[in-house]
From Swiss-Prot:
It comes from Shigella flexneri serotype 5b (strain 8401). Pfam families: QueC. GO terms for molecular function: ATP binding; ligase activity, forming carbon-nitrogen bonds; zinc ion binding. This is 7-cyano-7-deazaguanine synthase. It is an enzyme of class 6 (ligase).
Length: 231
């Protein structure tokens, strides 16, 4: 039996990964992390979607220690979430230091226990947000370290790594879940479900990708299939 664990926030990317994983694996587990994030509504959204989509199990892990250590606009209400700035340089204040290091490591421990061969995460380098822990080289390096430390070949899969946001919408549509992803996920840094607040960086990236996809579905769908190997 093929098993996988999806790092699941209830947002567009991780929900699309879950939808695909349910088609590719016999048993899919979800793990969601409560790190005291400002947009904590995502945890309830993740619970609802994991149940609705048919995950075998869904664990919500308390990692609020991260909140004490990692200062970010996503962990401190005293730091405002910035509006999208297309020319902004450097690492944005929405970056939570160590978040993906912790999430992927804990997901791998869970995968070890449930005998899953893969940990799936929706990180992406194409629409690079300035987060160093979304890079392909980081994921591969951590995967190598975790496999060595557990003496077990647990594979970190990043199905969205080389597709852009428009193609991520195409992937959801390929599996017949575009409306679900659009209306029932929570990507917004301000904790607003669906299309979100419309002005944070996450909402801007999501909306631009959707508009691009809807404006030229055949071309974007073809590009997504070529990059992912889907038919």
């Amino acid at each position: 039996m093929k098993r996988a664990v999806v790092v699941f926030s209830g947002g567009q990317d991780s929900t699309t990964c879950l939808v695909q994983a349910l088609q590719q694996y016999d048993e899919v587990h979800c793990v969601t992390f409560d790190y005291g994030q400002q947009h904590r509504a995502e945890i309830d959204v993740a619970r609802e979607l994991a149940l609705k989509l048919g995950a075998r199990a869904h664990k919500v892990l308390d990692v609020t220690l991260l909140n004490e250590l990692a200062v970010s606009s996503l962990t401190r209400d005293s730091i405002p979430v910035p509006d999208y700035e297309p020319e902004a340089d450097g690492i944005p204040n929405t970056f939570v230091p160590g978040r993906n290091i912790l999430f992927l490591t804990l997901a791998a421990i869970y995968a070890y226990q449930v005998k899953a061969e893969a940990v799936i995460t929706g990180v992406c380098e194409t629409d690079f947000s300035g987060y160093p822990d979304c890079r392909d080289e980081f994921v591969k390096a951590l995967n190598h370290a975790v496999s060595l430390g557990m003496a077990k070949d647990i594979r970190f899969e990043t199905p969205l790594m080389w597709i852009d946001k428009a193609e991520t919408w195409a992937l959801a549509d390929y599996y017949g879940k575009l409306d679900l992803v659009r209306n029932e996920t929570l990507t917004c840094y301000n904790g607003i479900k669906g299309d979100g607040c419309g002005h944070c960086a996450a909402c801007n990236l999501r909306a631009n990708g959707l508009n691009h996809y809807l404006a030229d579905k055949p071309t974007v769908m073809a590009a997504m299939k070529q990059k992912t190997g889907l038919r």
